Amino acid sequence: MVKSPKIKILNIISGSKYGGAELFFERLALSFERCNKIEQKIIIRNNRNRSKKFIDGIDEIEKINFFHKLNPFCTFKIEKIIREYKPNILLSWMNRASSVIPNIKINNEITVGRLGGYYKIKNYTKCDYLITNTSDLKKYVISKGWDTNKVEFIPNFVSQNKIDKIKSKINKDRIILCMGRFHPNKAIDILIKAMPFLPKFRLFIVGEGELKSQYEILIKKFDLMSRVKIFEWSDNISEFLNKCSILVCPSRHEPFGNIVIEGWAHKIPVVVSDVGGPGRIVKHKTTGIKFEKDNTFDLVSKIKNLNSDKKLKRKIVINAYNVYKKSYSEEVIVSHYLSFFRRIIKSCAE
């Protein structure tokens, strides 16, 4: 039997220093590198931390300092790499990377844009296909005029390789964990305002962003300094997940919510707002608990009820972990990417 040739992927991201899409790009790129059915080259904005993560895991890396469509060197370098590397698939992440890819085909590469939010579709006019990480995003893209046959929904995965099965004894201290960017969309302020009504709990907030000083003001205002701690973002999120008893995602807007899947994989019960990705993927009292967006008192009530109902908590943890294994594991998602790439390569060759 003749083996199928490897799929050659040129994987491109500009990306911020931190973020959910950036974190998943790193995971997926490393997974592609481990897959014996894929050959890969990546192009990233020059970022010391990202480069450090890839130094032992990815062989072919190109870096661009100023990742912008108005930078002629950026477009020229990408065109040169395509011409020399001859990829089957050019996978561009988010707005910036998708806007700087060439206007014309260089080696009959198939261009696939990857969206993780409700971005402006005009940035993806050079793409042949799109991948969204939620079914709602797929509907959004199609509503903007995209052919349903050219939009694929593939969710994110989380890796289990850093998950420590041995929980810390600190679990007994009733620690609530919240992780993410310090941005209005994340609604971390709602969780801080809930803490005066949850006197038996401590809160760990992990992240970075523009609202840190405002959170610190709220913490002092409600005299929560001894129970609420802010930590800088860490790539080893298992360190925090293994210390908490409940994970809360209070977002006002959240396209997917990687952290929810992280909680499932770590066997931590999750409490989420009833919006966006978390509101869609979590089944109330089955794989998590949902509360009304921006409703502090509903959040307090749901946390108290979950904590007091040990049977419900066990049920949620077991169900959520099973969903993670079935639908959000690395093996399942990488296989989906592979089958999608094979399908569109075959379709474009006919």
Predicted regions and their residues:
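N-terminal strand-loop element at the rim of the active site
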Residues: 11-74, 150-153, 210
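Carbohydrate-associated surface elements
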Residues: 136, 157
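Conserved acidic donor-binding segment of nucleotide-sugar-dependent glycosyltransferases
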Residues: 284-285, 289-296, 305-310
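A short, well-ordered alpha-helix in the C-terminal region of glycosyltransferases
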Residues: 298, 305, 312-327, 333-339
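Short hydrophobic beta-strand element within catalytic cores of glycosyltransferases
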Residues: 269-272, 282
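Aromatic "clamp/platform" in nucleotide-sugar-dependent glycosyltransferases that forms part
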Residues: 233, 252
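Short His-centered aromatic/hydrophobic patch
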Residues: 70-74, 92-98, 115
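A conserved mid-protein helix/loop that constitutes part of the nucleotide-sugar donor-binding site
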Residues: 19-30, 174, 178-197, 210-216, ...
